[in-house]
Amino acid sequence: MRPPAPAVLGLLLLLLPTGEATKKPTPCKRCRELVDKFNQGMVDTAKKNFGGGNTAWEEKTLSKYEFSEVRLLEIVEGLCEASDFECNQLLEEQEELLEAWWLRLKKKHPDLFEWFCVQTLKACCSPGTYGPDCLACQGGSERPCSGNGHCVGDGTREGDGSCQCHLGYQGPLCSDCMDGYFRSPTSETHSICSACDEACKTCVGPTNRDCGQCEVGWVRQDDACVDVDECAAEPPPCEDTQYCENVNGSFVCEECDPTCMGCTGKGPTQCRECIAGYSKESGQCEDIDECSLAEKPCLRDNENCYNTPGSFVCVCPDGFEEAEDTCVQTRPAGAEATEASPTQPPSREDL
């Protein structure tokens, strides 16, 4: 088989139908995936179907199988799933090139990806280079972006070669430390950016004594940045129905227990005062049972008192109805109750 012209193949591979560029894999990705599968196929077929027996015979036979068309066919047949249209299309277009590399060029060009995807099809670039002309990434192809970031388009015919820095790094070559990080040498030529202490906005070392500037919510004290206790400020930063909790560099306002009128912390034991209907008992705000007080709160004749959380209600008993601000008997004592007559005290939900 005669390989097609590489320039034509490269053009066919790079052209994608209008409107589908975002849906299909890039030419470089398709090429790389095919090469990865081919390389895996070589691993899977290495010394296949041989093991034990006549070693001398095996070595002689294996040496023939290693570079044979039989082995190539086994590899090629396993490259693409039947349903993978993109893979099968690329394989159909480039199978002759793969055969040429396998039979004649493998020793001269042992790196299939470099020969097939970079040099021949021009679908990809070598690592550390980018774009149509495979230019060196920022910082050089050997160590793009100072080793602290990603080169946009690295290894492809796309991108602009600029650096997208890893966390903690900044600058066109990702060689500078961001605020909140300091330079920590690892060798004579390389250094890393390590995180400052949380108290520091800028720093030269890892502790709160190495701060150049303190973060918001921290102040310099005795040559170190220490947390500001905002909860101790006057006036207090939280609402009257809240209590303040100091956290590193800030504070949070939490709601008081519903039984409290002002509080110093969480729960009914932290109330400054109790709301109406509650009183301090054993160190916490407890509901007052108004119905059990010596001075009865329900003053109408025949009226029953029911305690509720923080209050009470006055209700006419079974067989009585409220009329003209009093409880009037509507059913003689002992008479059978009707559906309209209450037969039990109201529930808390009803109240």
From Swiss-Prot:
GO terms for cellular component: endoplasmic reticulum. Its main location: endoplasmic reticulum. Disulfide bonds join 28-31, 137-151, 145-163, 165-174, 260-263, 291-305, 298-314, 316-327. Glycans are attached at residue 248. FU repeats lie at residues 190-237, 250-297. Protein disulfide isomerase. Might play a role in the unfolded protein response. May regulate transport of alpha4-beta2 neuronal acetylcholine receptor. Residues 1-21 form the signal peptide. It is found in: Endoplasmic reticulum. Keywords: Calcium, Disulfide bond, EGF-like domain, Endoplasmic reticulum, Glycoprotein, Isomerase, Redox-active center, Repeat, Signal. A motif (CXXC) lies at residues 28-31, 260-263. Its EC number is 5.3.4.1. SUPFAM superfamilies: Growth factor receptor domain. Interacts with CHRNA4. Component of a complex containing at least CRELD2, MANF, MATN3 and PDIA4. PROSITE patterns: ASX_HYDROXYL, EGF_1, EGF_2, EGF_3, EGF_CA. It catalyses: Catalyzes the rearrangement of -S-S- bonds in proteins. Residues 329-351 are annotated as: Disordered. Residues 133-175, 287-328 form the EGF-like domain. Pfam families: EGF_CA (PF07645). PANTHER family: EGF-LIKE DOMAIN-CONTAINING PROTEIN (PTHR24039:SF28), FIBRILLIN-RELATED (PTHR24039). Belongs to the CRELD family. InterPro entries: EGF-like_Ca-bd_dom, EGF-like_dom, EGF-type_Asp/Asn_hydroxyl_site, EGF_Ca-bd_CS, Furin_repeat, Growth_fac_rcpt_cys_sf, LE_dom, NOTCH1_EGF-like. It is an enzyme of class 5 (isomerase). The gene is CRELD2. This is Protein disulfide isomerase CRELD2. GO terms for molecular function: calcium ion binding; protein disulfide isomerase activity. It comes from the Eukaryota.
